[in-house]
């Protein structure tokens, strides 16, 4: 069975990458505010800020939350601006779009970590073979 992944599915940030981006965004102040009239101007401004900075915070006003959930607003902004939602905390959305392209940030399969016990067993087996030869 062949499964085709869309470009959007391929471009998921790993948990480790999101953690790093949240740390970088900690000191940032919101640069865009979304009000009750979320319009094309807001999307254009978010897009412009992402081109300039790469990582931004967007503040969602209470009036905007009367019509939509903050998570829906975050997803709509991310989709419209070809970005990824890093976090949604309170009324602040953190968005990320790399300036140099997505290739560097594509989700990769994690490498298999060898447990310490397995390493010790391997070393013991090697030592045992050497001892038998001598």
Swiss-Prot record:
Where the record annotates domain CRM, the positions are: 11-108
Keyword Phosphoprotein on entry: no
GO MF terms, alphabetically ordered? RNA binding
> What Pfam families does this protein's entry cite?
CRS1_YhbY
**Keyword terms, alphabetized:** RNA-binding
Q: Which SMART domains match?
A: CRS1_YhbY
Its recorded name reads: Probable RNA-binding protein MJ0652
**Natural source organism:** Methanocaldococcus jannaschii (strain ATCC 43067 / DSM 2661 / JAL-1 / JCM 10045 / NBRC 100440) (Methanococcus jannaschii)
The lineage, from the top, is: Archaea, Methanobacteriati, Methanobacteriota, Methanomada group, Methanococci
């Amino acid at each position: 069975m062949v499964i085709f992944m869309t470009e959007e599915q391929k471009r998921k940030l790993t948990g480790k990458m999101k953690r790093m981006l949240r740390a970088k965004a900690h000191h940032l102040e919101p640069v865009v505010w979304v009000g009750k009239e979320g319009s094309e101007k807001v999307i254009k401004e978010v897009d412009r800020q992402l081109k300039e900075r790469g990582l931004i915070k967007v503040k969602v006003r209470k009036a905007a939350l009367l019509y939509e959930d903050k998570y829906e607003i975050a997803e709509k902004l991310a989709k419209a601006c070809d970005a990824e939602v890093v976090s949604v905390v309170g009324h602040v959305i953190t968005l990320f779009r790399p300036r140099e392209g997505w290739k560097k940030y594509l989700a990769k399969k994690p490498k298999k970590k060898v447990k310490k016990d397995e390493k010790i067993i391997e070393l013991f087996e090697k030592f045992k073979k050497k001892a038998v030869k001598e």
